[in-house]
Regions:
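A short gly/proline-enriched turn/hairpin at secondary-structure junctions
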Residues: 31-36, 57-60
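Individual transmembrane alpha-helices with interfacial aromatic-anchor signatures
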Residues: 118-133
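A glycine-rich, coil/turn loop motif that links secondary-structure elements
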Residues: 33-42, 116
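Alpha-helical transition-metal enzyme core signature, strongest for iron centers
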Residues: 12-19, 42-57, 84, 88-98, ...
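His/Met- and acidic-residue-enriched segments that coordinate or traffic transition-metal cofactors
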Residues: 21, 25
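Short, helix-capping/interhelical loops that line the mouth of catalytic, cofactor-
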Residues: 1-7, 51-120, 149-169
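Short, solvent-exposed secondary-structure junction/capping segments
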Residues: 27-31, 138
């Protein structure tokens, strides 16, 4: 794998930090915002993000069965029961969750073949392509929701580094 396990965990934790930074920019009045009727609202997107990453990591590690809809329904139902603050707390917990889930995973485990959603891959490739890239994609979606709701001051620094842009001099 191109990334070390430590780099993978660090990258996933960085995604959590950026997501929480962006979530801190949400005005509660925009929680029901959705770009089109069939897209997730801001709160629904956050609720999905509160379980997507860790559940996919568990799937890659064989801790949940790929074809078991009960697993996804249980985590989805738990997420649906959360309010905004509880959802953010669940997301914040991912920092430790990722470290714990991947603690005993070896480089050999990451190179092991795995049946992903699109066919055979390695566990490491699945974790990078689906979990890490998925986190980046969905936080970008949240960023776009924020921009659409008038948060014009947000910049690429918010999106990619999870920080506010320096004040203009």
């Amino acid at each position: 794998m191109v990334l070390t396990k430590s780099e993978l965990v660090s990258s996933l934790q960085h995604e959590v930090r950026i997501l929480l930074h962006l979530a801190s920019k949400i005005d509660r009045a925009m929680l029901d915002y959705r770009p089109t009727p069939k897209q997730r609202s801001t709160l629904e997107l956050l609720k999905y993000l509160s379980y997507m990453g860790p559940t996919l990591v568990k799937l890659a590690l064989g801790k949940v069965e790929r074809g078991d809809p009960g697993v996804w329904m249980a985590v989805r139902d738990a997420a649906e029961a959360r309010d905004f603050d509880e959802t953010l707390a669940a997301i914040a917990a991912h920092t430790e969750t990722y470290a714990t889930l991947l603690a005993d995973v070896s480089d050999e485990d990451l190179r092991a073949e795995f049946e992903g959603f699109s066919g055979k891959t390695t566990r490491g490739a699945f974790l990078v392509n689906l979990v890490l890239c998925g986190c980046a994609a969905y936080r970008t979606q949240l960023f776009l929701y924020l921009k659409a709701c008038g948060r014009e001051e947000l910049t690429t620094a918010n999106l990619w580094r999870g920080v506010d842009a320096p004040a203009a001099v």
